[in-house]
Amino acid sequence: MVNFYDDVDESKSHGEFPLIPVVLQNSSELSVRTIPTGNEIIESVHLTKWLRKYRNALASQLDRYEKGWQSKIANFRLQVQHVINYSRKNIFNVDSENKHTVVPGSLIALGAFFSGSIAVNRSNWGAKRLIFGHKSSILEKLCTSLPSRILLPWVLAAATFKYWAPQTSQNLVNATENDLLPADFVKSYHNTWKRIYEEGYVAKKCDLKRQIDQTLQKNIRYAREQLYEKLEQA
């Protein structure tokens, strides 16, 4: 049997041996230290350095993640507060609408959006129940077309909210145009709307109204002249 304990007399030691073998105490790869409890422990020098380095790196990485997360939370809170302050100043700045019409108008607009979503769903027009004998009506084709499926729910919601809170809805449109959309895009669609609606629809409507008015005036004048001639002949 190999004695690692440097010629300890077992007959006089009463079963007590050194806790740290001499062979391990003299090794440069190992170190012996006393922990706060009073016990001596053996630890690998290189392993301890590697573990300490890994632990410090992990703690530093976690600290960076925590600081980054806290910074993101702080920035998010600032952004939310900025949005709230901006909305109060530029959109929801009409006290009468804020107190009476904005909330019910928003709920009814939400209902209008869901109603539009139901109206543009093909399955709600009986297409699945009558696959072979179903004949699509003009209204069904109009409601279930691709542009209607994209625009109709939003148009209904916007029109409903505008009816209930006209000034707030206009503020929302102005804020979107001024601060969210590119200026060139806003100018382009304003010109397109002016050309289609004002110079197109409105101009043709006024022209048609003027033509009808002129035609009515001519017909009335002709009828009066005919009546006057008949009365003179009589």
From Swiss-Prot:
Coiled-coil stretches: none
Q: Where in the cell is it found?
A: Mitochondrion inner membrane
Lipid biosynthesis is among the record's keywords: no
The entry's keywords: Membrane, Mitochondrion, Mitochondrion inner membrane, Transmembrane, Transmembrane helix
Span-the-membrane segments of this chain are 101-120, 142-161
Pull one GO CC term from this UniProt entry.
mitochondrial inner membrane
What membrane topology is given?
A: Multi-pass membrane protein
Lineage: superkingdom: Eukaryota
Per the entry, what this protein does is: Component of the MICOS complex, a large protein complex of the mitochondrial inner membrane that plays crucial roles in the maintenance of crista junctions, inner membrane architecture, and formation of contact sites to the outer membrane.
* Protein family (similarity comment): Belongs to the apolipoprotein O/MICOS complex subunit Mic27 family.
Quaternary state and interactors: Component of the mitochondrial contact site and cristae organizing system (MICOS) complex.
State the protein's name: MICOS complex subunit MIC27
What is the source species? Saccharomyces cerevisiae (strain RM11-1a) (Baker's yeast)
Native organism taxonomy? Eukaryota, Fungi, Dikarya, Ascomycota, Saccharomycotina
**Source gene?**
MIC27
